[in-house]
Amino acid sequence: MHTHTSHGIESDAMLRFHKSPVSALEPFYLPSPFVVNGEPLLLASLVSADENGWVVWWDLGTKRPLGTWRAHESTIVTVQQMGIHWDADVPQLHRNTFGKLLTHGRDNCVRIWDLFRVSSFSSMDWNLCKVLHKTRDTARNPDVYEIPVNALNFCNVATRAEMIATPASLSSESFDIYVVSNHRLERLHSNVDICQILQQNQRSNETDENRKFGAIMQITWTGDFQLAVGYESGIVACIQLQERHTQVVWIDSSHLTHPILGIVSNLDRVFTCSASDRIVVNSLQTGKTVAISKIKHKGISSLDVTINNSICLVSVTTWDGFSRIYRYDEDSSAAVDEALKGVFIPWTKLRRIPPKVIPNFKSSSNHQTIDLPDLKGRVIKLSKTQNGCNNALVERSDGQSKMILRSSEKRALTRYAFVGYQDGRVATYILCDS
């Protein structure tokens, strides 16, 4: 375990299981025995996935797996907890799907797994659905049902409440919407084509060819019936789903010609990244661009956003294998453009500490750098915690309700940064209060 601290972040641990490059990470929130002002708090665990289809569910307290299983026959593109979404630091739970995990692989399948069930939402009592064996040879899958999807491109799958958005079964330029209802999957919208919708609604002389956006690369929910979709062409579109038709709310072309590689919605803002070196921030309501930052590292392959003590942190992993965290501020005097009020301020650069004994490494001529391809970061994720979970108001709900948290319990409820690496390891960091 490392103890190095840098600018509000502390190295925590290195998790080892995967034999293939890590391809996806997801903080997975569990009920906890803690409350603040009578409200139950959630405890973060972690789900990691790799290019060989394996999933590991990690206990962040013990740094050991709660379960391991092979979920897909090839690379896992998406892992996402169902039944929860966050409004800043306030979690919204959905009873029908809380406790389920969605995985999406390049084997053309989306699978939904039952990991735990809440027996009482008033007391947040819960139990594991099935004991998951911890070794590869005896790994046994949790309960599951699945959806066949198009995996011709690397588009993710996104879920909110009981809704699931997937690439369309027949076209890479369209998407489908499913709902989980009574342990069944129903398709609500089929083959939604944004270019076709714009063509039907256009009042200009634009041709069909000018309306082609290319394959869908990224999709995320921005509201209960609203999505942001990123395309191969660099276009980002915000879509409002309605019962009889779909409305295009706004379109942004700040990334034009660079495929969209990441979309995150937070605090009435939509953050996007692409194969360029740009991070763009748009107003969720109007689509107005409020920030464009060139971070000078092309190919932003992973993007996430969290709020840490009222500070907006934006994390990225780039094609050079490094992970970086920026502080995003719309009230900064550093803004140089009145129209673009948001600025990105470098916060920290995450460096994985290599082992002391490194076989077959190559050093540069000046002996200042080490060429270690397996140390390249692939994906970064930031966890969330509820407002007030790191102060003395946090109590236990098991009869010792006035007991102030011990330091170890506070640590278990803190915010994390996770980085998945090319060699299959996952580094965990703690986002400090200061």
Swiss-Prot record:
Main location (coarse class): nucleus
Domain of life: Eukaryota
Ranges that cross the membrane: none
Keyword Nucleus belongs to the record: yes
Swiss-Prot/TrEMBL GO biological process terms: chromatin organization
WD repeats: 17-68, 74-123
GO cellular component, one term: nucleus
Localization, UniProt: Nucleus
Keyword Secreted tagged: no
InterPro entries registered for this protein in UniProt: WD40/YVTN_repeat-like_dom_sf (IPR015943), WD40_repeat_dom_sf (IPR036322)
Keywords from the named record: Chromatin regulator, Nucleus, Repeat, WD repeat
Family the UniProt entry places it in: Belongs to the WD repeat ASA1 family.
Function: Component of the ASTRA complex involved in chromatin remodeling.
Oligomeric form and interacting partners: Component of the ASTRA chromatin remodeling machinery complex.
Protein name: ASTRA-associated protein 1
Originating species: Komagataella phaffii (strain GS115 / ATCC 20864)
